[in-house]
Amino acid sequence: QKCCSGGSCPLYFRDRLICPCC
């Protein structure tokens, strides 16, 4: 999985709110 806007999938829930995993 990767961040929807690019980069690796965030590890922490609060970061996933900013950059969801796709």
UniProtKB/Swiss-Prot annotation:
User: Which terms are listed as keywords in the entry?
Assistant: Acetylcholine receptor inhibiting toxin, Disulfide bond, Neurotoxin, Postsynaptic neurotoxin, Pyrrolidone carboxylic acid, Secreted, Toxin
- Expression by tissue: Expressed by the venom duct.
One of the record's GO molecular function terms: toxin activity
Q: Does the keyword Secreted apply?
A: yes
Q: What domain of life is recorded for the organism?
A: Eukaryota
Which residues form each disulfide bond in the chain? C3-C21, C4-C19, C9-C22
Q: What is its main location?
A: secreted
Please provide, in alphabetical order, the Gene Ontology terms of the cellular component aspect for this entry.
Answer: extracellular region; host cell postsynaptic membrane
Q: What else is known?
A: Negative results: does not inhibit mammalian neuronal alpha-3-beta-4/CHRNA3-CHRNB4, alpha-4-beta-2/CHRNA4-CHRNB2 and alpha-9-alpha-10/CHRNA9-CHRNA10 nAChRs.
Domain comment, as recorded? The cysteine framework is III (CC-C-C-CC).
Q: Which family does it belong to?
A: Belongs to the conotoxin M superfamily.
What protein is this chain from? Conotoxin MIIIJ
Q: Which organism is it from?
A: Conus magus (Magical cone)
